[in-house]
């Protein structure tokens, strides 16, 4: 009786061991599949490239509070070239703008009062996604999208970073729009530093024209960027995560 009972126990133990082995093998396969999926997903994430448009080895100091103190106002603009690149804000691959920076001067109280009176208050800026209209000269750009307006008063004297979520396509230009004024401007630089503004040709230097200028802020419309300024730079950068 005991021997028969022992033989039955042995057979049952063997069957249990086989089931346990199968269960362990299935679990191992599941873990391996999850690990491989996680590795694949991680590789896809790691393959995305982050590009900082407009970045240079050094950033020039903004013009204020030194004299002459200059700021940009009532305009949409973009950098045509800087010391290191042509069209430094042109997008080369599909992706998304994730953040952008402005290097802001700290104007004196009297300088701030002047700009507030001339352009309006408070100092503000936003990003603009532009696409050139083929065959136009002076160039015209379609405003494809734009970011939120940021008030700059709390950040004067700093380099500030703002978050963003703007889709971009190859060929887009990421510009900056200033509804009032922004002391994110350096002048007296080398001849390679050139930027364009959303003003009509012939309305580039007269103070009345500049004051009455209108930034390009209606999405889906076209604007003329007929004014080109040399030896100066708009002090912004844009971080794009490419798809």
Across the structure, where does each feature detected by a protein language model lie?
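Activation corresponds to long, low-complexity, non-globular regions
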Residues: 46-53, 209-243
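A broad structural signal for short, well-ordered beta-strand segments within beta-sheet-rich domains
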Residues: 97-99, 143-146, 236
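Secretory targeting and sorting signals
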Residues: 4-9, 15-44
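Aromatic- and Gly/Pro-enriched, solvent-exposed loop/edge beta-strand patches characteristic
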Residues: 45-69, 119-211
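Short beta-strands within extracellular/lumenal beta-sheet-rich domains
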Residues: 72-92, 158-160
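A short beta-strand element within beta-rich, extracytoplasmic domains
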Residues: 93-120
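Extracytoplasmic low-complexity repetitive segments enriched in small/polar residues
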Residues: 81-84, 101-103, 118, 129, ...
């Amino acid at each position: 009786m005991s021997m028969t009972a022992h033989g039955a126990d042995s057979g049952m133990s063997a069957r249990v061991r086989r089931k346990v082995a199968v269960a362990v093998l299935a679990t191992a396969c599941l873990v391996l599949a999850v690990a491989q999926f996680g590795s694949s997903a991680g590789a896809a994430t790691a393959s995305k490239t982050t590009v900082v448009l407009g970045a240079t080895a050094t950033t020039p100091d903004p013009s204020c509070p030194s004299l002459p103190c200059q700021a940009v106002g009532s305009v949409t603009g973009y950098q045509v070239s800087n010391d290191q690149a042509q069209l430094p804000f042109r997008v080369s691959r599909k992706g998304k703008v994730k953040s952008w920076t402005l290097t802001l001067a700290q104007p004196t109280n009297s300088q701030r009062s002047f700009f507030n009176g001339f352009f309006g208050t408070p100092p503000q800026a936003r990003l603009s996604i532009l696409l050139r209209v083929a065959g136009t000269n002076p160039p015209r750009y379609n405003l494809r999208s734009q970011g939120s307006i940021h008030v700059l008063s709390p950040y004067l004297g700093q380099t500030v970073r703002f978050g963003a979520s703007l889709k971009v396509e190859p060929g887009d230009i990421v510009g900056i729009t200033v509804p009032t004024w922004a002391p994110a401007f350096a002048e007296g630089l080398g001849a390679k530093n050139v930027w364009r503004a959303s003003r009509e040709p012939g309305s580039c230097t007269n103070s009345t024209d500049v004051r009455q200028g209108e930034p390009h802020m209606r999405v889906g419309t076209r604007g003329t960027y007929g004014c080109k300024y040399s030896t100066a730079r708009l002090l912004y950068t844009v971080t794009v995560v490419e798809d």
